[in-house]
Amino acid sequence: MTIGVVGRKCGMTRIFTEEGVSIPVTVIEIEPNRVTQFKTEETDGYRAVQVTVGERRASRVTAAQAGHFAKANVAAGRTVMEFRLEEGDYQAGDQINAEIFAAGQLVDVTGQSKGKGFQGTIKRWNFRGQDNTHGNSVSHRVPGSIGQCQTPGRVFKGKKMSGHMGAERVTVQSLEVVRVDAERNLLLVKGAVPGATGGNLVVRPAAKARG
């Protein structure tokens, strides 16, 4: 796993190329990622860098978290993330920002999808509806059979049924970085990314190379 950064989704807009082509982009604010801990194979069994972003009131931080942040001499953040490292060294207090990316680079963006609440199978799993007429009574949006009879006598795990939709960890792969604004700590990524405006996003170099 290659090092990435934690950002905040600002929303979507579009930019134009010199030829006048409109490109839809998502604006991601890459707040300074403050290093809270650098893990090594000698001390932790693997190499990784732990970062925090944003701010959090002291009353909302547990004693253990407060001690961890104080040991690193960094302000308490709203979240803590960890990135595996193959090479490179960091120290507690270092900052990582949008400058680790370049225009044209492919990235993977991870976030929490928008919650949709309890939904039926048509909206949740794209099931087709049943007949509107021809003897159908109050079964227009029901899923139908969910299994067999005495054998196996149960509903298999993973059966697509009604339930809570959204609010899941989602990763969109191989999105192109259109522009990097280092002065304003902004990253413009082509296309849409998961989650609502203001949500946390994790941006990493793409795991799968095209071509």
From Swiss-Prot:
GO biological process, one term: translation
Gene Ontology terms for molecular function: rRNA binding; structural constituent of ribosome
Processing and modification events after translation: Methylated by PrmB.
Modified residues annotated as N5-methylglutamine in this record: 150
Signal peptide as annotated in the record: none
PROSITE patterns linked: RIBOSOMAL_L3
Alphabetically ordered keywords of this record: Methylation, Ribonucleoprotein, Ribosomal protein, RNA-binding, rRNA-binding
Taxonomic superkingdom: Bacteria
Described purpose of this protein according to its UniProt entry: One of the primary rRNA binding proteins, it binds directly near the 3'-end of the 23S rRNA, where it nucleates assembly of the 50S subunit.
Family: Belongs to the universal ribosomal protein uL3 family.
Protein's name according to its UniProt entry: Large ribosomal subunit protein uL3
Lineage: Bacteria, Pseudomonadati, Pseudomonadota, Gammaproteobacteria, Pseudomonadales
Gene that encodes the chain: rplC
